[in-house]
A protein has these predicted regions:
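Flexible, glycine-rich terminal cap/loop adjacent to redox cofactors
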Residues: 16, 20-24, 28-39, 47-48, ...
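Rossmann-like dinucleotide-binding cores of NAD(P)H-dependent redox enzymes
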Residues: 72-73, 163-165, 171-230, 315-318, ...
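Short hydrophobic core segments
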Residues: 116-126, 250-259, 323, 401
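Glycine-rich dinucleotide-binding loop and its adjacent helix/turn
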Residues: 123-183, 221, 276-277, 282-284
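FAD-site-proximal beta/loop scaffold in flavoenzymes
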Residues: 138-159, 233, 237-242, 248-328, ...
C-alpha cells in the first residue's frame, strides 16, 4: 500500500493587541506583551511626539542637572520597531467601538481618520493639566508641564529670564521652585490654600512652608491664600500677574501647576465605567467593565490598600506596574495589581518631603479614630558630620493600633523612614508590631534609637491596644 502523506496546513492565529498611549504604562504594556507573545501583532498609538519617557524627571532637566533631554527617554520608537512593536506617533484615538472591537484613530499630521481592529485593547492615555479659568490665561509664555516639549520650552524660557511665576504649590510647583532658584531666577509661587503641599496634614504643610521661607534668602516668595485673577501682556507674552487681593507684579513667564485630571472621555463614551474618583474603573487584573478592554496608568483609579478605598494617584512607579499587569492578562496570563499605599517623595532645595498611607484628616473621614505623634530628631548620631533634623509624624487607629500613615519632612534622610513605614502598612502592622523591628544602626546612618522607633514607642501609649 502506498504511503499517503497528508499535508496539513495550520492557520496560526496571531493576537492583535492595540495600546492607546505610550509614556509609562503604555510603553511598559507593549514591552511586556512582546516578551509574552513573540508573534502577536502589537500597535501603539499616541498623540505625543515621544514615547516611554520619564516625565517625573522634567523639573530636574529644567534645573540643569543634565543638559540632554534625551536622557529622559527610556525606549525609542525605533527600538520598539526592532522588536516588531509598531509605534504610531501623533496619532490620537478619538473613539472606541467595543461592539466591533475597533478604535477610530486620527493622524494629527494629515487629519486622516481610520479604523483599527483589536483582539485586546489596553487604554493608557494618561492625564492632562488642569487649566484654571484666569483672564488671559492663553497668553504666550504661560506654560504647563506634562510632556517633553513642555520641559524644553520652559527651560529655554528660564535661561533667558530673570523672574518666574509658579501658580500652585503642590509637587510640581515645589520642584519647579527649586529648579528656577538653581537657575538663578527670582521666583514667586502663588497657592490658593493657606499652605503649600496640601496633600500632607495641615501641621506638616505649615512646617514645610516655614522651613522653605527660612531658606528663601530673598530668592523666592511664597504667597498663600491667594488666587490669580488676571494675566496681562501682549503678543510677545505675559508681562504681569494680578491676584485676588489686588497685588500686581511683573514676570517673564508663568507655569501653571494647578493639578491634573485623568483622560477618560473616549472610555466613558464607549460605555466603560468610571470609578468614584472620576478615573477609569478597573479590577485587580486591570480589566475595565467591557470585555477584552484593559486600562492602566494615570487614567485609572487605584485600590488604596491601607483603607480598602479608592484613590487617583498619578505616579510613574504605579503606572509601570499597572502596565505590566494589564499586558500579562491581555496576553492570557493571570496577574493581579495589589494596589497602592499613597507613597510619595519630593525635594525642594535642602528640604525632603515624603509620606505614605493616610493623613490624619483622611483617616478620620474614612471612619477611623486616628491618633498621632510628631517627633523631631536627628537623622544620624549628633557627633557625625552632615547630621540633619527630620520631623516625623506617625498615625495609627486608636481602637486597633493599626498603623495608618506617616509623613516626614526635613533636611535629613526622610525618605528612607517612609519606605520602612510603607512596608509596615503593606503588612497591616500595628504600631506595637512595628516597634519590634530590628532597624539598622551605625553612627553615620542613624541614631541609636531611630526616629521611627522613637515615634512608635510614644504612639504605643496613645492607642487602646
Amino acid at each position: 500500500m502506498a504511503n499517503v502523506i497528508n499535508q496539513v496546513f495550520i492557520y496560526i492565529w496571531c493576537m492583535k493587541i492595540v495600546i492607546l498611549g505610550g509614556v509609562a504604562a503604555g510603553a511598559k504594556a507593549a514591552a511586556k506583551a512582546r516578551r509574552l507573545l513573540p508573534d502577536a501583532e502589537i500597535d501603539l498609538y499616541t498623540d505625543d511626539t515621544h514615547i516611554s519617557y520619564s516625565s517625573c524627571g522634567l523639573p530636574y532637566y529644567i534645573e540643569g542637572n543634565f543638559e540632554d533631554y534625551r536622557l529622559l527617554l527610556v525606549v525609542s520608537p525605533e527600538e520598539f520597531e526592532k522588536k516588531n512593536v509598531h509605534v504610531h506617533l501623533k496619532n490620537r484615538a478619538v473613539k472606541i467601538i467595543p461592539e466591533a472591537k475597533q478604535v477610530l484613530i486620527q493622524d494629527l499630521s494629515t487629519q486622516r481618520a481610520y479604523l483599527v481592529d483589536y483582539d485586546k485593547l489596553i487604554i493608557a492615555i494618561g492625564a492632562r493639566p488642569i487649566i484654571p479659568k484666569i483672564k488671559n490665561v492663553n497668553l504666550p509664555n504661560i506654560f504647563t508641564l506634562r510632556k517633553i516639549e513642555d520641559g524644553i520650552a520652559i527651560k529655554e524660557m528660564a535661561l533667558k529670564s530673570t523672574h518666574a511665576t509658579i501658580v500652585g504649590g503642590g509637587y510640581i510647583g515645589i520642584e519647579l521652585l527649586e529648579a528656577f532658584v538653581k537657575q538663578n531666577l527670582k521666583v514667586t509661587l502663588i497657592e490658593y490654600s493657606s499652605c503649600v503641599m496640601t496633600t500632607f496634614d495641615e501641621d506638616m504643610s505649615k512646617l514645610i512652608q516655614e522651613q522653605l521661607n527660612s531658606i528663601s534668602n530673598n530668592r523666592f516668595k511664597i504667597m498663600t491664600s491667594e488666587i490669580v485673577t488676571e494675566f496681562s501682556g501682549d503678543i510677545d507674552g505675559v508681562k504681569s500677574v494680578k491676584t485676588g487681593t489686588g497685588k500686581v507684579f511683573d514676570t517673564d513667564f508663568v507655569v501653571l501647576c494647578t493639578g491634573a485630571t485623568p483622560n477618560v472621555e473616549i472610555a466613558k463614551d464607549a460605555g466603560i465605567d468610571l470609578g468614584v474618583t472620576g478615573a477609569i474603573k478597573v479590577n485587580e487584573k486591570m480589566e475595565t467593565s467591557i470585555k477584552d478592554v484593559y486600562a492602566c496608568g494615570d487614567c485609572v483609579e487605584e485600590h488604596l490598600v491601607v483603607s480598602n478605598s479608592k484613590i487617583w494617584l498619578p505616579l510613574g512607579s504605579n503606572a509601570n506596574k499597572e502596565g505590566r499587569t494589564a499586558a500579562i492578562n491581555a496576553c492570557g496570563g493571570d496577574d493581579k495589581f495589589f494596589g497602592v499605599l499613597g507613597s510619595s517623595v519630593t525635594r525642594c532645595l535642602n528640604l525632603t518631603m515624603s509620606m505614605t498611607g493616610l493623613t490624619e484628616k483622611r483617616a478620620a473621614m474614612l471612619g477611623y479614630t486616628p491618633v498621632s505623634v510628631t517627633v523631631t530628631k536627628n537623622d544620624k548620631v549628633g557627633y557625625m558630620p552632615n547630621v540633619n533634623n527630620i520631623t516625623l509624624k506617625l498615625i495609627a487607629d486608636y481602637n486597633t493600633g493599626k498603623l495608618l500613615g506617616a509623613q516626614a519632612v526635613g533636611a535629613g534622610d526622610a525618605d528612607k523612614r517612609i519606605n520602612a513605614l510603607a512596608a509596615a502598612l503593606l503588612g497591616g502592622m500595628t504600631v506595637g508590631e512595628f516597634y519590634k523591628n530590628d532597624l539598622t544602626y551605625a553612627p553615620p546612618f542613624s541614631p541609636t534609637i531611630d526616629p521611627l522607633l522613637n515615634a512608635s514607642q510614644i504612639l504605643m501609649n496613645k492607642v487602646k491596644t
